[in-house]
Amino acid sequence: MTEDSYKKFIDIGFDDFKKFASDDSLSPNEKIGFPDSYRQGYDNHIIEDIESKLGEVRSGQEVLDIGPGCSNLAKAYIEKCYQSNSQITLVDSQEMLDLLPNMSNVIKVPGFYPSSDIMAKLNNEGGYDKIICYSVFHYLFIEANVWTFLDLTLNLLKPGGRFLLADIPNFSMRNRFFNSVKGAEFYNKFINSDKRNDNRKFDLHEDQIDDGVLIGMILRARNRGFHAYVMPQGDHLPMENRREDLLFVKP
């Protein structure tokens, strides 16, 4: 894909990803909104980072993956669950789910999370030991109610269960980084080599996630009786300098 082609990945949502899933001109990474350069060769590192926070999948555990997409990362995590003799439930559009393997340990639930019909199905499953939502929250932030999403997802955890809301683009973090010496060098090298990054303002658009959103979610979860943490990404991940994770634990 050319640089101009990536304009189609700006201001997108659930229905757009359904179309991407059916577009054979896109690679698996592009179908989920990523240039190949942002994901190729990183799958093992990402899984290691996930497991450092969620823990390794153990035999008999129930796992929920919200918005897995169709890339090799999703397939690798499904295989890891299979090898660990654990069941994984996948929630995404039918078009995306059709691109993922049908295996004995896989339950596919097509639809938009957290719609009422999806939640009715998931609430009948008895809860989950691990919930992962990777690189999806910034779309849900626009299309769903943040607090409803958080509350309903926390309700699905078993005692001792963990929910990792991961790979969140935090524009406060991004601005802090780009206004540092190292960040300015990164900006000039990878973002725009023709224009110096001299913006010292921490401007924020209404559809962007900042520190306030993430800290607010942490406080809400803690006030509901859950442990909650802001977690850095491993320095071997492609966007660790401007993305971070939230980890929620049910005592």
Can you describe what each PLM-predicted range is?
Residues 69-117:
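Class I SAM-dependent methyltransferase SAM/SAH-binding core
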